[in-house]
Amino acid sequence: MAVTTSKPRVGWSSIEELEVDLLLEAVYRVGGFDFRNYARASLWRRIQNRLRAEKVDTVTRLLDKIVHDASCMDRFVRGLSVNVSAMFRDPGFFQALRAQVFPLLRTWPYIRVWQAGCSTGEEVYSLAIMLAEEALIGRCRIYATDMDESVLDKAREGIYPLEPIQKYTQNYIRAGGTRSFSEYYTAAYGNAIFRPALRDQVVFARHNLVTDGSFNEFNLVLCRNVMIYFNRALQERVHHLLYDSLAHFGVLGLGSKEMLSLMPLRDRYEELDAPHRLYRRMT
């Protein structure tokens, strides 16, 4: 098995570094999931968590278990995938969408949106609510994608625990919501069940930013808080993918810690709202 190794990180032994390289190569070859260019610091923490969860004491033993046990492979992939999401997360971003991006979307007769790395779907429903309030949802198609089919199943259900709903309500208000947030869900058995109509214009599908290509031309692409887990080479690869997926004058939205200014394609965009990481493709 040919593996490209790199300089050991601080706190890693050279053997651990080699074990991790072999593990990630095996996961790619056997399972088709490519974590080889994820940022190693956060990756190592997640691998350590998997060691404890699987009750093995070395990465090599974890590798053996993953290769010979499909359920262990599934658990490993879920454990390494980043599935942190919330409704109207970063309310200022959604305010900026409403104020600066939606007026641009109105200029297109039909609007295609790509929510890349949608996780369990909270941000997808947040976006659908805002588009509905701006009377845009009827001429939209939202493509919500993730590499993990299990989180896509959760997103398709649109059922979330009631516990964080109070926080989500405050986020909705701060994001400029114009109605009562409770109108969008029904409370039952400790869960908030979101209105099925919110996903009428949503297509949930599996797509891997690391290995898959562009599949449509979009007026708005949101890829937020995903690339912070990638190394520089993979970030550049994904930025090219997002650029290729944008229509001319389409808008790209990134996470608060993700900087377009550090990427090779930065000169092909204009800043719409730099603090909220909103950029418009110009060439």
Please name every model-derived segment.
Residues A2-W114:
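Conserved AdoMet
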Residues H248-S256:
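Conserved beta-strand signature within the Rossmann-like core of class I S-adenosyl-L-methionine
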Residues T120-I137:
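Conserved SAM-binding loop of SAM-dependent methyltransferases across substrates and taxa
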Residues R139-L222, V226-L234, L260-S261:
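Extended basic-aromatic, gly/pro-enriched interface segments that bind polyanionic ligands
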